[in-house]
Design a protein with these regions (language model features):
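Alpha-helical transmembrane segments of integral membrane proteins
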Residues: 1-22, 256-261, 290-316, 320, ...
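Membrane-helix entry/capping segments
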Residues: 1-24, 53-54, 68, 109, ...
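Short, strongly hydrophobic transmembrane alpha-helices
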Residues: 18-46, 50, 281-284, 326-331, ...
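Alpha-helical transmembrane segments
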Residues: 31-64, 291, 340-350, 424-453, ...
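Small-residue-rich transmembrane alpha-helices
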Residues: 39-42, 287, 323-396, 434-437, ...
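Membrane-proximal extracellular/periplasmic loop immediately following the first transmembrane helix
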Residues: 48-101, 209-214, 442, 446-507
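Mid-to-C-terminal secondary-structure elements
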Residues: 101, 115-140, 147-269, 342-343, ...
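Interfacial "coupling" helices/loops that link adjacent transmembrane helices in transporter permeases
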Residues: 282-326, 404, 703-742, 802-803, ...
């Protein structure tokens, strides 16, 4: 123990004696450890521990896969259907849910509250207890009866609205002028649905009232086995309401982990590979620095060996110094990771991670960082220690100077490390360039509509208000008209479900006179005539509806060019008739105009627009008047002369003029909405972080190259002096230095190009542009070669300025 303490003190003294060496080594490690720890923090939160619910991988969504392979068809269940599903041998539980926005009416200012109406078997389904009070219980929603007016708060809403009042249980909260008793507060990580409150759901046996199910399969049952058992049950449900189900569907049961956590996994693993490369470059730097530093200490080590120090004793001393560097590096790295986490989280795509996931520097992440430090200590410290612990005692003791020449083996080892650094750096630069090009292409993509200066204002209708079809149609139109009349508003239109970048309701359609058995599918969009003007979607052929046709719910349709080309060879669909079977009147939730289930004549064709993401192929689309099928919700699209959200207060004021109690849900700037999409956000995240990591890698590689060349110059000083004494010129010495470096850099570039080709095959999911682009590879290679030349210039000049007489005296 005493000898270990002595080693630690000696190591600290040695590191303090060389602050430049110590700082460079520590920073090289800290950057790699910090970046790796930050990425691992996100991986741990999103992929390892995304949900606090026991058996989260057994909680599944009920989806249907259509003939095209799309699984974006969701199944709604009535109470009786849920009961049938619970009887399946593979099913442990089924919880029914619905989402709605309410308004608090017990304070000075109303506040929008996101509510999750949930069946009272939720405690068993999610397997979590309330933090305070209780969860919902069966008596809160007796079958066939109206639910009790009770509410359970999320931890976040309790903190925000009630400031964490510990005496909240038993108090009441007014929601849309109805008192609800607060019976519980959930733990901080219980955030299912990302809502504010949980209210008991009224479950009825009415087959027309369907809500979203969450299915929990039994332990030991695979998702495939459960899906196979549920397939005939869901097929029976489909016979009752064929219009709600795609043809020839297959049941799919993705877990909530599959749906909400794992999609980001490949991107995170790609970034982990990038930071691992950065760590390898940093570790190679430290190995180079330790070898160079050790070469200066060969005389000291020879003296130690001569007076009896064993090899293991010297290895332990050298590893202790490496451990000191690693310890300091991990402390600084954790601090860098802590600060860098904010940057990563801020640039994660919106809704790309579960609300329950907590990204922070927790104990597992700290243990990972410590383990990483230990591994890197062995990785970068052991090999130099083994090399330096075998000094040539006789030769070194006979030398009259402490300056020694480096061995050919040491120079080759350094060269191999430099080549590896160059290869990894070129790979990262190429990946960063490809990711950057892909992101720029995405930014400049032609969407077919103009999202700039436009916002979406969601308007929900409270239960038992505007129930009649005519009243609801006039109410929505009145709000739109008041907003459109504002001085700073260019235009306003209504979009029930057609707001890009993700819009439409995928439905099979019938074509009058068609003899084909298979029905084509199209996106059904409910809009008014102003919708196209707001989004700058041009009319290509025919006409749009007039105001009277809109307010009457006249069954007339407008289609996009893709649908016209696919269904009619000459692209002219004007005058043809189509039918949508899914339009059913279900008061008070859905109000449908008379005749909406009849044949609809096509009166116009509009240009294509990407209203389902940014990269997917444009799908057939059918636009019908919003009054044909109205929900308890609509959106007003508003194009403005100024920044859209700057008018939000004035827009709310106009809405209040129509109905003082009308709430407004989350208002979105369409352009910002696009930038929050997963495909946009992931591409931006990869491009940004690869750019940062590649710059750091380039800097570390330059430091490593500088260190190697400096080491080579120091160990070959005598050789250079002799050459110059024999007549060599400055250019000859520079050529010697640069030629040796060129061999290492050239080998690294060749290896880097091969790695880039391999990377191109593996990373097509995240990097849409090819990393084999000759222009990109040439540009990256030139950048790397120029950086290498600059890193070599100073030590090369030092070699060329060696005084021959001084060098000869040292020999």
């Amino acid at each position: 123990m005493q000898s270990l303490w002595t080693d630690l003190r000696f190591a600290a003294r040695e590191l303090r004696k060389r602050p430049g060496f110590t700082l460079t080594a520590v920073l090289s490690l800290a950057l790699g450890i910090g970046a790796t720890s930050a990425v691992f923090s996100v991986i741990y939160a999103v992929l390892i521990d995304p949900f606090p619910y026991p058996g989260a991988d057994r909680i599944v969504e009920l989806r249907l896969v259509d003939k095209s392979g799309s699984d974006r068809h969701y199944v709604g269940l009535s109470g009786s259907q849920a009961d049938l599903l619970r009887q399946a041998k593979s099913v442990e539980d089924v919880t029914l849910m619905d989402w709605w926005n309410l308004t608090t009416t017990d304070g000075d200012l109303p506040e929008d509250v996101k509510a999750n109406y949930i069946s009272p078997n939720a405690p068993n389904h999610w397997g979590m207890r309330a933090l305070m009070g209780r969860w919902l219980i069966p008596s809160d929603a007796p079958p066939g009866e109206s639910p009790q007016p009770v509410v359970v708060l999320t931890y976040q809403f309790w903190q925000r609205y009630y400031r964490g009042d510990p005496h909240i249980i038993g108090r009441t909260i007014q929601l849309v002028h109805k008192p609800y008793q607060i019976v519980g507060v959930m733990p901080p990580r219980f955030r299912w649905g990302d809502v504010d409150i949980y209210v008991p759901l009224k479950v009825t046996q009415d087959p027309n009232i369907e809500v979203s199910p969450s299915v929990k399969i039994k332990p030991g049952v695979t998702k495939e086995q459960a899906a196979a058992e549920l397939q005939p049950i869901i097929e029976e449900f489909a016979k009752q309401r064929r219009e709600r189900y795609p043809e020839s569907f297959k049941v799919k049961l993705p877990s909530i982990v599959d749906v909400y956590a794992r999609p980001l996994g490949p991107t995170l693993y790609l970034l982990l590979g990038a930071v691992a490369s950065l760590l390898l470059i940093g570790s190679a730097n430290v190995s180079i620095l330790l070898l160079a530093r050790g070469t200066e200490r060969r005389h000291e080590l020879a003296v130690r060996a001569a007076i009896g120090a064993g090899r293991w004793r010297m290895i332990r001393q050298l590893l202790t110094e490496s451990l000191g560097i690693a310890t300091t590096g991990v402390v600084l790295g954790v601090l860098l990771a802590w600060r860098g986490l904010g940057l990563m989280v801020a640039n994660l795509p919106e809704n790309s991670i579960p609300a329950e996931a907590v990204i922070k520097m927790n104990v597992p992440v700290l243990l990972f960082s410590v383990a990483l430090a230990f591994v890197t200590t062995v990785a970068f410290g052991l090999w130099p220690a083994l090399q330096l612990s075998r000094p040539e005692v006789a030769r070194l003791m006979q030398s009259s100077t402490r300056r020694v020449s480096g061995s050919v083996r040491a120079r080759r080892s350094h060269g191999a490390m430099v080549a590896a650094q160059v290869a990894l750096t070129l790979l990262m630069l190429t990946a960063a360039g490809a990711a950057g090009k892909g992101f720029l292409r995405l930014v400049k993509a032609d969407l077919g509509y103009d999202p700039h200066s436009t916002m979406s204002v969601p308007i929900p209708v409270h239960e038992n208000t505007h129930v009649e079809w005519k009243d609801r149609a006039q109410y929505f139109e009145q709000i739109r008209a008041r907003i459109a009349a504002m001085p700073q508003v260019v235009a306003a239109g209504i979009s029930t479900n057609a707001t890009p970048p993700a819009s439409g309701w995928r439905q099979p359609i019938e074509i009058l006179g068609s003899t084909t058995v298979e029905k084509p599918e199209a996106r059904l969009e409910f809009v008014d005539d102003g919708y196209f003007g707001v989004l700058h979607i041009p009319l290509a052929q025919g006409r749009l509806w007039d105001h009277t046709e809109i307010m009457r719910g006249t069954p007339l349709a407008v289609i996009n060019q893709t649908m016209a080309r696919q269904l009619w060879p000459n692209g002219d669909g004007i005058g043809h008739q189509i039918k949508m079977a899914a339009l059913k009147d279900q008061p008070p939730y859905t109000r449908t105009a008379a005749g909406s289930d009849s044949w609809m004549q096509i009166i116009g064709i509009v240009a294509d627009s990407r209203t389902d993401g940014l990269r997917k192929a444009v799908m057939s689309a059918v636009y019908v008047p919003f009054t044909v099928n109205m929900w308890m919700f609509t959106q007003i699209l508003v194009r403005t002369h100024v920044a859209p959200l700057a008018l939000l207060h004035d827009v709310r004021a106009q809405i209040v003029q129509v109905d003082p109690e009308q709430q407004v849900m989350q208002v979105r700037d369409l352009n910002e909405w696009i930038t929050s999409l997963d495909e946009y956000g992931q591409q931006r995240l990869v491009a940004m972080l690869f750019g940062i990591f590649s710059v750091l890698a380039l800097a570390l590689a330059a430091v490593g190259l500088y260190s190697v060349v400096s080491y080579g110059v120091a160990t070959r000083t005598n050789e250079f002096g002799i050459r110059m004494a024999l007549g060599a010129k400055v250019g000859d010495v520079l050529q010697l230095v640069f030629s040796a470096t060129a061999m290492n850099v050239g080998g690294g570039v060749l290896a880097g190009v091969l790695l880039s080709v391999a990377f191109d095959k593996l990373a097509t999911r995240w990097v849409t542009e090819s990393s084999r682009d000759p222009v990109l590879l040439l540009g990256v290679t030139v950048l790397l070669v120029v950086t290498a030349a600059l890193a070599c210039f100073v030590p090369a000049r030092r070699a060329a300025s060696v005084d021959p007489m001084e060098a000869l005296r040292c020999d």
